[in-house]
């Protein structure tokens, strides 16, 4: 009772054919086939075009070590160093 037999699938197929008609089912299957072909073509195109932006050049044992400058968290601007203002004795104003 848990699995469907061949006769169940035959009845389902006949009901689908009666509801949608032979033309609609064949049109739907053609659209599915076109979608699969387009997907496979897209996958083949991705495999033939290596992503050069993320590729890392090989490093030999005698190559110098390159370091990247430290950057803050994304979206934050670097803060300028805090400098104490210099106030001379003659610059005081009464508030």
From Swiss-Prot:
InterPro entries, sorted: TatA/B/E, TatA/E
Region described as Disordered: spans on this chain: 42-95
Record-annotated membrane-spanning stretches: 1-21
GO CC terms, sorted: TAT protein transport complex
Domain of life: Bacteria
UniProt-listed GO biological process terms: protein transport by the Tat complex
Keyword Cell wall biogenesis/degradation on entry: no
UniProt keyword annotation of Transmembrane helix present: yes
Annotated keywords: Cell inner membrane, Cell membrane, Membrane, Protein transport, Translocation, Transmembrane, Transmembrane helix, Transport
Chief site of localization: membrane
Record membrane topology: Single-pass membrane protein
HAMAP family the UniProt entry points to: TatA_E (MF_00236)
Family: Belongs to the TatA/E family.
Role of this protein: Part of the twin-arginine translocation (Tat) system that transports large folded proteins containing a characteristic twin-arginine motif in their signal peptide across membranes. TatA could form the protein-conducting channel of the Tat system.
Descriptive protein name: Sec-independent protein translocase protein TatA
């Amino acid at each position: 009772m848990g699995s469907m037999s061949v006769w169940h699938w035959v009845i389902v197929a006949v009901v689908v054919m009666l509801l949608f008609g032979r033309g609609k089912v064949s049109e739907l299957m053609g659209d599915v086939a076109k979608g699969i072909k387009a997907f496979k073509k897209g996958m083949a195109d991705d495999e033939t075009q290596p992503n050069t932006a993320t590729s890392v050049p090989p490093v030999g044992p005698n190559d110098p070590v390159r370091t990247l400058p430290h950057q803050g968290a994304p979206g934050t601007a670097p803060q300028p160093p805090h400098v104490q203002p210099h106030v001379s004795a003659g610059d005081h104003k009464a508030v």
